């Protein structure tokens, strides 16, 4: 089931965030990316949150800031289902473009985004921090709705 994120979800979202990302967001960052200008969704399976999406909207554009799936549920199609639901809801709100940034090394995510119609726009050099203190490039992608 895909639903809007509520405050009671944040402990579970934080668990997923810590497990799913190389350099995860803090709980504070998760909490700060909420409110009227966001469309944030969770994917629940048998009353267990297994994935979430954090998306900010501004006028007729949106930016997908975070998409995370519990590692135990990765590679099973949940990210694509959640992303498709997000895209459909954004279209219903009159959003014309969905933007995102993804680590250049995250080819699995890039394939997911390609599969729903995203286009690579450019590379942002040295954007993402790495655990060793170095930086990694970001691939900027856009989906025209």
Swiss-Prot record:
Subcellular location(s) of the protein: Cytoplasm
| Active site, UniProt feature | 101, 113
This protein's GO CC annotations:
cytoplasm
Name the principal localization, coarsely classed: cytoplasm
Alphabetically sorted, this entry's keywords are: Acyltransferase, Cytoplasm, Transferase
Spell out the PANTHER family in the cross-references: ACETYLTRANSFERASE, ACETYLTRANSFERASE YPEA
- Which protein are we looking at? [Ribosomal protein bS18]-alanine N-acetyltransferase
Which species is the source of this protein?
A: Haemophilus ducreyi (strain 35000HP / ATCC 700724)
């Amino acid at each position: 089931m895909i639903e809007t994120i509520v405050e009671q979800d944040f402990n579970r979202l934080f668990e997923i965030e810590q497990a799913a990302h190389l350099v995860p967001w803090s709980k504070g960052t998760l909490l700060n990316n909420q409110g009227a200008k966001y469309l944030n969704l969770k994917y629940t399976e048998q009353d267990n949150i297994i994935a979430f999406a954090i998306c900010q909207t501004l006028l007729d554009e949106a930016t997908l800031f975070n998409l995370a799936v519990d590692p135990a549920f990765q590679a099973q199609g949940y990210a694509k289902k959640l992303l498709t639901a997000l895209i459909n809801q954004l279209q219903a709100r009159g959003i014309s473009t969905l933007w995102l940034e993804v680590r250049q090394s995250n080819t699995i995510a890039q394939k997911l985004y390609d599969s729903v119609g995203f286009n690579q726009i450019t590379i942002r050099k040295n954007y993402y921090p790495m655990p060793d203190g170095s930086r990694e490039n970001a691939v900027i992608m856009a989906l025209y709705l």
